[in-house]
């Protein structure tokens, strides 16, 4: 008998929120599951997701993802109403929920979605506890990034 080959997909990442790292200081990251409908899973397999404006809100002791857009496919089911901007429940442990809820209420943090990816057959969302950056902080980050690139370029030419 032949051995079964391990399936290795190209990339597990579905969507990233690059703007979140630019606008916020990310203090801590959590991995959360996502409660989805069938048409949403099919759209995510096609890569039709956008989480650039998404954030997490708490209602009745549960966490929900707001602002994430999952565009339905043209061949989506006709008997189900496809709502792209629907709020989706995040699946977290009670301890994680309590920790996030406490930090948001007491310490003034916000919770933003950083990335959406596949983990085996499940869709996971990486969420981050974040604090907003001021304009001068953003400029400092840009300056540091540019200096890092210049330094690498200088070192490359110095070694020749």
Swiss-Prot record:
It comes from the Bacteria. CDD domains: SmpB. One of its GO terms (cellular component) is cytosol. Keywords: Cytoplasm, RNA-binding. InterPro entries: SmpB, SsrA-bd_prot, SsrA-bd_prot_CS. It is found in: Cytoplasm. One of its GO terms (molecular function) is RNA binding. One of its GO terms (biological process) is trans-translation. The keyword Cytoplasm applies. SUPFAM superfamilies: Small protein B (SmpB) (SSF74982). The keyword S-adenosyl-L-methionine does not apply. Its main location: cytoplasm. Transmembrane segments: none annotated. Required for rescue of stalled ribosomes mediated by trans-translation. Binds to transfer-messenger RNA (tmRNA), required for stable association of tmRNA with ribosomes. tmRNA and SmpB together mimic tRNA shape, replacing the anticodon stem-loop with SmpB. tmRNA is encoded by the ssrA gene; the 2 termini fold to resemble tRNA(Ala) and it encodes a 'tag peptide', a short internal open reading frame. During trans-translation Ala-aminoacylated tmRNA acts like a tRNA, entering the A-site of stalled ribosomes, displacing the stalled mRNA. Belongs to the SmpB family. HAMAP family: SmpB. This is SsrA-binding protein. It comes from Yersinia pestis.
């Amino acid at each position: 008998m032949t051995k079964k080959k391990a399936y290795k997909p190209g990339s597990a990442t579905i969507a990233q929120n690059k703007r979140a790292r630019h606008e916020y200081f990310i203090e801590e990251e959590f991995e959360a599951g996502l409660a989805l409908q069938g048409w949403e899973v099919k759209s995510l397999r096609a890569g039709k997701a956008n989480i650039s404006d998404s954030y997490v809100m708490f209602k009745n002791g549960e966490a929900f993802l707001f602002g994430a857009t999952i565009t339905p496919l043209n061949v989506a089911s006709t008997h189900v109403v496809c709502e792209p901007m629907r709020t989706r429940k995040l699946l977290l442990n009670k301890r994680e929920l309590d920790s996030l809820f406490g930090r948001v209420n007491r310490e003034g943090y916000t919770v933003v979605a950083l990335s959406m990816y596949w983990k085996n057959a499940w869709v996971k969302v990486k969420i981050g506890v974040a604090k907003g950056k001021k304009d001068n902080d953003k400029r400092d980050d840009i300056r540091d990034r540019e200096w890092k690139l210049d330094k690498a370029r200088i070192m490359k030419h110095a070694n020749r």
